[in-house]
Amino acid sequence: MRLLSVTFWLLLSLRTVVCVMEVQWCTISDAEQQKCKDMSEAFQGAGIRPSLLCVQGNSADHCVQLIKEQKADAITLDGGAIYEAGKEHGLKPVVGEVYDQDIGTSYYAVAVVRRNSNVTINTLKGVKSCHTGINRTVGWNVPVGYLVESGHLSVMGCDVLKAVGDYFGGSCVPGTGETSHSESLCRLCRGDSSGHNVCDKSPLERYYDYSGAFRCLAEGAGDVAFVKHSTVLENTDGNTLPSWGKSLMSEDFQLLCRDGSRADITEWRRCHLAKVPAHAVVVRGDMDGGLIFQLLNEGQLLFSHEDSSFQMFSSKAYSQKNLLFKDSTLELVPIATQNYEAWLGQEYLQAMKGLLCDPNRLPHYLRWCVLSAPEIQKCGDMAVAFSRQNLKPEIQCVSAESPEHCMEQIQAGHTDAVTLRGEDIYRAGKVYGLVPAAGELYAEEDRSNSYFVVAVARRDSSYSFTLDELRGKRSCHPYLGSPAGWEVPIGSLIQRGFIRPKDCDVLTAVSQFFNASCVPVNNPKNYPSALCALCVGDEKGRNKCVGSSQERYYGYSGAFRCLVEHAGDVAFVKHTTVFENTNGHNPEPWASHLRWQDYELLCPNGARAEVDQFQACNLAQMPSHAVMVRPDTNIFTVYGLLDKAQDLFGDDHNKNGFQMFDSSKYHSQDLLFKDATVRAVPVREKTTYLDWLGPDYVVALEGMLSQQCSGAGAAVQRVPLLALLLLTLAAGLLPRVL
């Protein structure tokens, strides 16, 4: 296959070789310029065409600019530079380096620990770390980028060095000795045998480079080393010459996997931080990559052998390393896709996203959209509190009339962030293109940031039915518009075709689907009587069906009580509701004797399940609220700010003068964040509104768009989804608590 690919490229290049008389190669040092000139002379002497000219730049970035300006044509770049050149300047990779025939044009970045330690990828905070050097691919860019992108490490104000210094319990990062964070980042470095050159980014620092970082771990200075997949095997089992490694055995070390597990050193293909792309030659987007490969391929056929007059893949003659190409290159191959994203790969791209924070481009302010006078007051207090602690970027507060107005303002660039609930997140993403930057966590023991919507029935062998057999049954709901008790179950039933509203009249359709229901509402007037038929009001029979605690079947516990007391056959509640009201957790007379084992869940697949199997048997997983921003906003900066802020202000009893997750001081609820929030959390892999909401929730939410509703497809572009429900209601019908 490789022969066919090479042949194709050579034939393709013949069309343009006669037109292009020379290729200008950009170099970044005097030594590289000299090697380039020697290569040009060698190629010319061998009759290789087109001619190769050498243009010297100041750096890789400078060369990229020269290529963009057509003052140069080609340069070999590493992964990070390829990303920047492709994303910002439209350059494309056309020829790749191969270092190992077994794995081709890539290698793997791994995290290594001692086998007898208990460190995992999830417990790296506070451990001592060993790195190959600052800005090195596998020793810095990949691990730090991965930790940021995955949410393990938060970075405020693009200050990555400070974030890493605060995160680890001491490090050796050669090359950071002149930074303001050298105390932590150079703490583990040892220098040479005389104790000089500590933290130098050179072999004078004994813990520099791949072998040095591993030595840092092996000698007990550090707890984790970020190196290449081959580093441990190259320095253990008698494979290393230095005395420090002679007694080391590879079996005494393990790899940290992204899923929190560990693996043997030889399992790097499945257990690594990222697959790292090889260096590649890049050119302008309009240049023929086949021509470049034809030139270099003819060269490597003649000048990649030990006895050849010129050595393409060696820099020894210039007393340097990796000039023009990496010295470890075995051969050059054409890149078929000529696309920087395809060449870099998803794992590497994700890691790079975590590092894409330029302090020079960081906005001075993060403008927060607020919706009420109390929220404006709390936002102002937050801005002052953050500023006093020198948190960056600073907060500014921008007022809006509604969540949708906030979405419009953010899309237009007039404000930057707002916290939204489920259906508003859907609209913000679908209509305005916004993305989640951070989420809320409501219980420390539940890392999913959400809860499950379940349909609960009594365990009764004589009256057993499934979720597909709800027509004609009696239903219990917390209140009209409740996420778990109305939006999701009714939306799901509509989407699955069981409930078919006519003219957007969801209420009538639901009242006709069930035999009877209790759906408490703020104003029961002009409300289908069947939706109040099962409600009982207070102890004196008053306030029946009212959307407040005066109705005994109001709320999630009330809906479950409706089922318990045999008023209804099914209750739509949260997955926690049954447990909160059974086995002694609720002392009220109606619940004190209940056992959760006497109830079951109705599953979408037609089965029933125990109530503790809610993760596998549910109607949807409800997402937590999320901070939404424009897609060009650096989400890691937003989370980095919130994470540092919550360390100071997240505890409701903190003494720092502001409570992020408490609104009682303002005589209101859920201002800026839900009061139930215990922490702001990173979005991790849920970087789009669809990812954040989850497929089941989206299906249920879209189910509210009845297929019988005229103009429903356009309605989503104009009004919130739940407004479709309100089309049939008089003003003030919904209860206040949604």
From Swiss-Prot:
Disulphide bond pairs: C26-C63, C36-C54, C130-C216, C172-C189, C186-C199, C257-C271
Keywords: Cell membrane, Disulfide bond, Glycoprotein, GPI-anchor, Ion transport, Iron, Iron transport, Lipoprotein, Membrane, Metal-binding, Phosphoprotein, Repeat, Signal, Transport, Zinc
Any one Pfam family match given in the protein's UniProt record, by short name: Transferrin
Alphabetical list of InterPro entries matching this protein: Transferrin, Transferrin-like_dom, Transferrin_Fe_BS
Subcellular localization: Cell membrane
Residues that bind hydrogencarbonate: T132, R136, V138, G139
Lipidation (GPI-anchor amidated cysteine): C709
GO cellular component: cell surface; extracellular space; plasma membrane; side of membrane
One GO biological process term: positive regulation of extracellular matrix disassembly
Residues annotated as binding Fe(3+) 2: Y451, Y556, H625
The protein's name in its UniProt record: Melanotransferrin
Gene (UniProt): Meltf
